Amino acid sequence: MKLKLLLLTFILVCTGCKNDPRIQAAYDLIERVTPGYGEQFKLELMEPIDGMDAYEITSDNGKVVLRGNNTISLATAFNQYLKYTCNAHVSWFGNQLDLPKQLPMPAPVKNTINGKYRVYMNYCTVSYSAAWWDWERWQRELDFMAMNSINMPLSVVGLEAVWYNTLLKHKFTDEEARQFLAGPGHFAWQWMQNLQSYGGPLPKSWIDKHIVLGKQIIDRELELGMQPIQQGFSGYVPRELKEKYPDAKIQLQPSWCGFTGAAQLDPTDSLF
C-alpha cells in the first residue's frame, strides 16, 4: 500500500512539474531555438542557492537534464549546455547550431547567476538598434535575453501609442498628437525628454501596429518570468499643452543644438 502511494505521489509530482508554466515556457524556448530537440531534454525546477537564481546541467537515461529555479535559470542552463557541451553559439550576428541528431550528454554543472536584477537595454539601444524590428526579430531577442540570464529588460515598444491616446484626451487632435511624436529612429531622444516632433509625424498605422507589438513583447517577457521596465510620467509634455491649458504651470526649456526646448509640467500643478 505504501509503495502504491509513493508511486502515485511520484507520478503526480512529475505531471505537475511538466505542466508548470515556468517549465512549459522553457520548453517552448528550446523548440524556438532548436526545433525538434525539445524531447531530448528533461526540465525540472529546483530551489535557489543562498537566495540566488541557480541552475544545474546533468543527464539521465539518455536525456539532457536542465534544472533551474525559474524559467530564466532554465534558459541559462540551456544556453550553457549549447555553448560548452555542443560547441554551439547563439548571438546577435548569427547562430551556429549544427547539432547532431542525438545530443551529447553533458558533464554535471551547478552554478548560481550573479545579481538579483539583471537589466538589459536603454533608450538608445532600443531606438538605434530595434526601431524597425518586427515580432519575429523581437522573439529572437527575447529568447537571447532569457538565455543570457536577463530578467529586467526595458520595454518601451508602443510607448508612442500611450502618448497618442493620452493627448487625444487632453484637447489634442489626431494630427496634433501625431505631430508631437518623433520618428522611430529618434524615440530615444524623445523618451529622454530632450525634443519633440523631430522626424515625425508618425502615421496612425505605425501607432496601431506597435500597440500590438508592444503587447506581444510584454506578454512574452512575463511568460519567461521577466519584470519589464516601463516608463512612468515625469512631467515632460508637448510645448503646445501650454496653449491648451494656459493656466497650468508649464515651463518651456531652453533650446539646444538647434532643437527647440521641450516643456515641463510642474509636479505641484493639478494637471500633473
State the predicted function of each range:
Residues 89-91:
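Conserved short beta-strand edge segments in small beta-sheet-based binding/regulatory domains
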Residues 36-37, 44-51, 58-67, 71, ...:
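Aromatic-lined carbohydrate-binding surfaces of glycoside hydrolases
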Residues 22, 83-86:
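Aromatic-residue-lined binding/catalytic grooves and analogous aromatic/hydrophobic interfacial grooves
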Residues 20-34:
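Short, non-transmembrane alpha-helical segments in secretory-pathway proteins
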